[in-house]
Each structure stands twice: as structure tokens, then as C-alpha cells.
Amino acid sequence: LSISLAATALFTGGTAYAAETSAAAQSGTLSDGKNKYSAYSALYAAAETPDNTVVIPGEKNFTAADGAEAAAGSYGGRDGVLIWKSKGGSVTWRFEMPSDGKYSVRLTYFSLDADAQDIELGLLLDGKTPFFEASQLVLPKCFHSETEITKDKNGNDIRPKQIPYDEWITEPLGDHTGVSDKPYGFYLTGGAHTLTLTGALAGIGIEKIELYNEKEPVSYSEYSKGAKTAGKEYTKVYEAEAPLYQSAKTLYPVYDRTSIDTSPSDPIKLRYNTIGQSNYSSHGQYIVWTVEVPEDGYYYLGARIRQNISTGTNSYRRLYVNGSVPFKEAESIKFEFNNRWQDYVFGGSEPWLIKLNKGENQLKLEVVSGDMTEVIAELQELVTNVNELYREIIMITGASPDTYRDYHIDKEIKDFNERVKNMSDKAQSVFDRAVSLGNSRSGNFSAITKLKLLLDGFIKKPAEVPSNISTLSSYASGISGLMTTVKSQPLELDTITVSTVTDKLSTKRRGFWGNIAFQAKAFAGSFSEDYSSIGSGDEETNRKIEVWVSTGRDQATVLKSLSDGVFTPKTGITANISIVAQSLIQASLSGMSPDVVLFVDQGSPVNLAMRGGLTPLSGFDTFKDVTARFQAHSMDAYLYNGDYYAIPVSESFSMMFYRTDIFESLNLTPPETWDDMYKIIRVLQQNNLTVGIPNADSSNVMAVDTGVFATLLYQRGEKYYTDDMKSTNFDSDGGIDTFNIWTEFYKDYGLPNQYNFLNRFRSGDMPIGLNGYTFYGMLKQTAPEIDGLWKMALIPGTRDENGNINRSVCATGTCAVIMKGSRDKEAAWKYIDWITDTDAQSSYGQEMEALLGSSSRFTPANVKALSNLSWTYNEQQLINSQWKDSFMLPQIPGSYIVDRNLISAFRKVVYSSANPRETIVAYNNTIENEILRKRKEFKLD
């Protein structure tokens, strides 16, 4: 809470306790990542939790600021609500509290934006953020199926489109990362206050904000006193894949073809017969079903479930009945790992009797961390402590210590032995607790035992610490990865059963021989059934196109699902998706080329076009409409001899990432220009820290990233090639100076050529660097221990003579092409038109993130699609600002020789200390001779 809030406590009769704790809370700025909810909660652990509820109407006593488009009005069938249309800005309400105490906060809201994902907000009390997590609040946007599951002309199921669930929803503000299952508690003194919501990704209608305290649920034994089942025997089975609504667009029906008992099932035809799997694993996600009973009374609940994804770990859910948790045991329901389908009875060996009302009732299963909450919190603390120790060690030894030197680490670092012993004990206690909860001793948690053994060795032989610092960093990364795994809570559901008798909760099994017959039919059907030929309902179509993709299986599966579910019903054209790593030149020459190829690297289209292997695209009727979806520069890499031969699919570029905690400790500010960066390099190197300027791929020491050279060149106002595209500008004064600057980073400043930026950034020995902007999502998913301790920013620029900063950055991308041998070029173009539009790119990105997490966040070339992915409003603004300053390198005949010789020149200067000017001029002569030869070969001159 803020200093002003502490003052309010003193002047409104607040207790001495309130004044002391508020003052303590203000020892630091609570909005940064060092002030977590765990510390805030401990500070107010003894505070009262009054049973009164304070209601703040959305339409009253509010002030909109910072550009927020907010006004009182009517929406969604309700009057007197706040309608906040913009994604950014802030809205502040004034309200009175009757007494001191700790309160939870819940909102009754309506998502206004049909295209958006979750709503993201920040909360301030009296103008201050009470703790870091309050700046990253998430309210889910709910969806439901537009129709029931239908069938195509071949009898295969068509998955229904997921559309927004346009109803008012009440949701408490709480953790969405898996560290806590309870709503946040906010301490307030009696008297006047303000509550501010800041829009990270708003677009929300707010009916009311409530400050409340939920009564603790009673135990099941108390809840069920005198409980009896309803009078008449009753059993009804519900298909889990047909819920009322769910908290994510990607919680749609999926399929299982492994069991004859899955309902419904078919050995040959595709049936969307389950819901969940890995899509239903993120903390706070939920699915709501409607069940109906003939009379008031108590009923048993069962479900056919499977948790076969997180090996050796459990998944947890919280059960709500008609909006509330019925009893304490329902707050954390454990589903154990098993490769087989299970008939789960709620309550286990002593089934629960749950009160339902006559008519419709709502059942909700929410993803929680359950018994693992404490384990997750302790793992996070352990990783943080290990990384702090690692950073202290390398500030003494450097990242590459002399293994024959005794650095006396145990004496140089204060309380070294005690700290290491505490970490070792913590590792052991976390491991023991995880195993006691049913997790596998030899599975994922074995990473903890490795860390403990290493730490114990440090105590016994501190002289060996320097030779093991890379191992320490690696083990810390392993624990962080374990934490991510533990937070994932996948579950798949087939059916939900409501019954007055426990015997009817089990699925009627068709036995071993039934399954054998089912699998035999499925095997035989695989030879005759054309699963790729999915038509548009009853409409007959013979139009088919072959689409090759050079991605992983997960990406191809998502693409296939979208093609079958959206493109084919819309156009009547079937797209057969194949994962192919074959050379396109070979395919073209062999006459076996597909119609469309997706995710082609940006260097290939011109290379294929000059050999006659691609179809020029400018002549298609919607070409101008399609290309208007992208940045103006995005087509530059696909222009050859006056025509365009590809359409952008994805595009990425670098942003700057820096550790705010380390910068603060060293009194540094993020660099605006490269001159600022040089100063930062010197300060960091004085502390045995370094900077990450991309050069070599972390998995390939021989690779060199020439994008930094291109970035520096364009920032100076130069271009890669001359205007006639017949030669480079490398031997110009600007080109030579840029080459010299580029090589100086590694030759003179000693920056590392090869490094793992994720590991070194999270450990802190590389607290600043450049990386693709999707590194943001990777940090969010895989490095939760440093959440709030880093920021993303624009890359350093070059200041011109007028004082303006040029932040040009080299972008890279993939594209879609139509092969020259396509038999239906119009159908192929329709597919490219569809896959690059806003809806398709948004859906593809959303589904990939749901499947693989934020570390695999898609980088669409479609500008509008970016706003439909899981970026906050401020993040979108930042990325778009850098995107507008990006450029794509043109491709010319002989492009391959440009990079090859530029890399050779770089190596000769950096590794052999050659003269930069002489070297780049000599290699540039070779480049220009090859360009001239290629132009003659393809009759361009």
C-alpha cells in the first residue's frame, strides 16, 4: 500500500498495527518484481478479515485517465455499468471502507472485444501498486461452441467454431501462475480510498467491484450431515466435450481413438469425443457444464478421465457447484497419472453426496495447483537463491574461471557455507514433500537431488566451486524447468455422470476382445478412409490442393485442424497438409511439387523464382488486399525482376531485454544508443558480467548472425545493396565503418561469440542483450523466478547529426509460395489469402500457444493479428514501434555468396586479427564478381 494510505490509516483511526505494517510495506517500491505477494501476505497475515462486503458500482464515482475511453451506460442487458472500450488507460473509483481489514476483490465484468483473448489489468490502491502481482491481473475471456458437433459428407465430425460467451461473469482477482490457489488479499484501513484499474489489455464492461471475504467452506463431514440421495433412482450421462462455456478459446472438443469405451466412438470415422488434454492445463482455466436433475436432493458425481501427459505427477481441480465450492475437500481434487482411461468417482472410496437443485445446475472444474502449491513456491525460492549465489560467484571468478586457482569462495562470499547448507536442506525438503504427494522419485524431481549433491560438494570442497559454476547454472535451469512442468495440470474428460447410486458412475466396458475388434477395424479403415478429404457439410467438392509445411508435427496438426474446420467449409477446397523437408528445387525438377508451400525461409523464393519454379503472384485479383495486411517492407525479400513470388506468413526481429534488478544495483539505465551501450559494457565487465549481442547460434559455433551488421548499417542511413541491386555497399565508407564497429564488439570488447542467452540472462551474468521478441514469452514461461525483474525495450539506435535516433532493425521471416507446377493455382491462392488473413493468423497463434506455451508464441506477419495474441496493450505498442522501424533484406541472384563472404571476413578479423578495412574490401570483390556472374547466367544484364 502507498505512503498516502499509511497516512490515511493514522488520520482515520487506524490502529498502530496498520500504521507500522503500512510503513514497512513502503520500504521499497511495491510495483517491481522484488516485492512479491508472498512478502505482502506475510506482512498482513494477522490482519482481520471482516465479513462485510463493500460494493463499488461500475458507473459511480469514477474518473477515467491516461486515454481510457470509459463512460457509464447500459450493456449486455444490464444498466448502470462502466463501458471501458479502449485497451489502455486507467479508471479510478472513490469508495469508503467501514473498518480496517484484509479483503479479496472480485469483478462482475463483460468482455467487449470479440477478437481479444483474456483481459489484463493492473490494480492500484490509493495510487500505489500493493505488490508486484497486482500489476499483472488476468480476467478470462470465455467461449463456447457456436453449434453442436456436425458431420461432413464423409461422416467425419467437424469441430464447432468457438465464439465468445457473451454473458456477465464474476471473477475474483488472484494468481494465474500456479503459485497460489486463493484470491489475493488486499489490506485497507477504514475510511476513504481510491481503487484504480490500469488497462494492459482492457476492453471491458464492469458492473461492480466487490471487496469481500469468502467464508471458508465447511468440511465434507459437516456438509453431508443428514444427507440422503434424492428419492427416485436417477442416472444421466453428459458428454464432457459439450460444456456450457469455458475460459479459453482453445478448450474445444478433441478426439480419442484409443478406446472403444470412449463416448461416442467409431473405429474409422473421426469423432470429437473428449475435451481437455494439454489445452486444459494452465492455472485458473476452467470448464463449466450444465447438468439437470428431476428433484432437489443429493447426488453422486463421476467422470471418465485420463491424465496421461505429465508423467509421474498429479493434476488438480477445484469443483464449484452453482458458483461456489460446496465443502473444503472440493477445493483440491487429485487426478493421478495413468496412461489408461479411469472411471473417477468424486470422493474416491467414500463417494461425495453433492446437493443439486431441481432443474439445471452448473458444475465447474478449475485448474489449481492443489497440494503442489507449497512445492511450487519453494522451488521458486530455491531457484532464486541458487541464481543469486551463482551471480555472486562469477562476480569474483568471472564466467570462465581459472580452475587451478583457489578463489577462496567460502571466505569471499559472506555466510557462504550457511547459505549453501540452507539451500541443500531446502532442496531435500522440497523433494521429500513432492514424493510424499505421490510424485515419482525417479522422474522430473530427480533434478532436485542432483542440485543437492552439488551443493553438498561445495561445502565439503569449496575450492572446487569455480570448476562447477556452469553445472550450478545448468542445475538451476533444470529446477526452473521442473517448476514449469509441475505448474502444468493437464486433464482429459470423456463423460460426466450424475446419479443417485454409485454403481451407475462407472462406464460400461466392452472388454478386451471388444477393444481388439475396435483396433482391428481402425487399422483396416486406415487403408481406405481419406481423412484428409473433409468437405463442407453436404456440399460435394473435387477441388483439392497439396500443402507442404516445413515445421514440426504440432504446427502441422494445428494447421490441419484450422484448414479442415474453417478453410474447407468456407471454400469447398480440401487442403491436404504434409510435413516435408525435401528441397523445393528438387521437387520442382522432379514434377512432384505441391500446390502451396508454407513457412518457406525468406531466401528461397527468389532463388526458386529465377529458375522458373514459382508462380508470380501480382496478377491475382486480391493481391493488393492481401499485401495490405503487412508492414510496407515485408514484401521486399520476395521481389524478383519486377514481380512478387511469395506472401509473408511470419516475421520476427530483435528487441532488447535487460535485468532491472541488476541495473538498479549497478546504478545503470537501459541504453538509448550504441554509445550508451559501450558505457554499460565497461561497467558490467568491471563486475565480471557481460552483454549479449547476437553472433553465433547457441547450438552451432560455426554460425554467424549477420543481422547485427545489417542493423548497424541501416541505422547509419546506408543500404545493403546499391539502388540497381548489382553490388553491395560493404566497401563504402559507411559500410567499412559499420563492419569495423560490428567486429569490435567481439575483438576489442571481448563479448562472447556463442552463448545461451536464456540461461545466462536468468542467472544474471548476462543482464542485457538482444534477442527475437518472442524471447519475452520464453522468459515468462521458463523463468518464473525472475518475473518482474526484467523488461523488454527498443534496441539501441544510432543518433544522426540532427539528434534523432535511428532504431532500424533487421527482420527475418517465412512465407508462402505457389509452385509453378500447381494444378489449381486459383485454389492455391485462395488458401494463401486465407492463411495470411487476420482471423487465421490469430487462431493459429492462439492454438500454438495453448499447445506449447508462451515460449512458442507465433510471430505473425499480419499486423492486426499481433493484437489478438497474448500481448498486453503496452507490449503491443512497444513491439509495433520497433516493427515499424524494421526492414527485410532484399534477395538477389547470388545472395548466398553475400552472407558466406561476410561471415568469412568477420572470422578473419575477429579470430585472426586481420585489418578490417582491407578484409571487407577484399571479400566484397569476391561477392560482386559472383553477383555479376549470376546476373549474366539468368540474363538480367
Regions found by a protein language model. Give the residues of each.
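Extracytoplasmic "Venus flytrap"/periplasmic binding protein-like
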Residues: 565-633, 637, 661-672, 765-768, ...
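Conserved N-terminal structural module of periplasmic/extracytoplasmic solute-binding proteins
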Residues: 386-606, 917-941
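Extracytoplasmic/periplasmic substrate-recognition and gating elements
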Residues: 99, 295, 783-856, 884-891
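Extracytoplasmic
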Residues: 19-499, 811
